[in-house]
Regions:
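Extracytoplasmic/secreted cell-surface and envelope-processing proteins
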Residues: 3-5, 48-50, 108-112, 138-142, ...
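Short, charged loop segments at secondary-structure junctions
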Residues: 4-9, 45-78, 177-180
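…and closely analogous acidic/polar surface helices at protein-protein or active-site interfaces
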Residues: 2-37, 53-58
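Sec-exported extracytoplasmic/periplasmic mature domains
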Residues: 26-34, 44, 64, 68, ...
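C-terminal signal-anchor/stop-transfer transmembrane helix together with its immediate cytosolic
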Residues: 207-247
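Juxtamembrane amphipathic/hinge helix adjacent to a transmembrane helix
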Residues: 184, 188-220
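VWA/integrin I-like adhesion module and closely mimicked acidic/polar interface patches used
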Residues: 73-76, 98, 105-176, 180
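Soluble periplasmic/extracytoplasmic beta-strand elements of cell-envelope proteins
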Residues: 20, 36-42, 60-62, 98-102, ...
Length: 247
């Protein structure tokens, strides 16, 4: 499936792409009550935000603290974060093991190994990789980031410095990754579309769970076969620590 809508700037919508994505992912996490979910952000190297866990409160708190500038890396390496996610999922036994890769960038500089190499490995391990390209346009407004102040640059009056920059998304490679792992590629142009994408993935990857009536929440940790395992990968967050993109 492919979905595409406009994510053009609006003076009435000051939220950044990161704000929008975090809100939608928060809703998705709440729906997957009995699944262990992990969260990984990445630039050149992956950044583990949260290991696989059933503790949704812990996961949500780690999601909330995500911000641009957690790493001083610049560039993107999709293969490295796929390897991280696959390695965490490979040894686990579950009816459902999926990665959800969300990005608004492309590999830069060119990687030593194509992400498709890792996609083929995921397919052999029966791991599905759903891919989501964020943004309908390659041109987007950006905040300039000051690495010394660890904050966005501002004019003397406190107004953020905003520029327009070009950031193409490699949709072809994202589509190929999804196809090779029997998953789907999506394009999200606005918040409602992104929400519908996660809703669709939620429906596609429902796992049958049988629990005794008196089962306690803590007991779920002892029953990995009854749960799905999901790793959410957010590439655009740390992709360029110098630039924070907004819709």
């Amino acid at each position: 499936s492919m979905l595409a809508l406009d994510m053009s700037p609006s003076p009435n919508n000051p939220n950044t792409r990161l704000d929008v994505v975090k809100e939608v992912i928060k809703e998705f996490i709440n729906k997957r009550k009995y699944d262990r979910i992990g969260l990984v952000a990445f630039a050149v190297d992956p950044y583990l935000v949260s290991a696989l866990t059933l503790d949704k409160e812990y996961l949500q708190s780690n999601l909330a603290r995500l911000k641009v500038g957690l790493t001083e890396q610049t560039g993107t390496n999709i293969g490295s974060v796929l390897a991280e996610g696959i390695n965490r999922l490979r040894p686990l036994e579950s009816k459902s093991k999926i990665l959800i890769l969300l990005t608004d960038g492309k590999d830069e500089p060119p990687p030593k190994h194509s992400p498709l190499v890792y996609a083929e490995g995921a397919q052999k391990d029966k791991i599905k990789i759903y891919t989501i390209a964020i943004g309908a346009s390659t041109r987007t407004r950006t905040y300039l980031y000051d690495p010394n102040a660890r904050d966005i640059m501002r004019y003397a009056n406190g107004t953020p410095v905003v520029e327009v920059a070009e950031y193409p998304v490699d949709k072809e490679i994202l589509q190929e990754i999804a196809q090779r792992t029997d998953a789907n590629f999506f394009e999200a142009g606005d918040k409602s579309t992104l929400r519908s994408i996660y809703d669709e993935i939620d429906q596609l990857e429902k796992t049958d769970i049988e629990l005794e009536v008196n089962a306690l929440y803590e007991d779920l940790y002892q029953w990995p076969l009854a749960c799905g395992f999901i790793i959410l990968i957010l590439g655009f967050i740390l992709e360029h620590s110098i630039l924070l993109r907004i819709p």
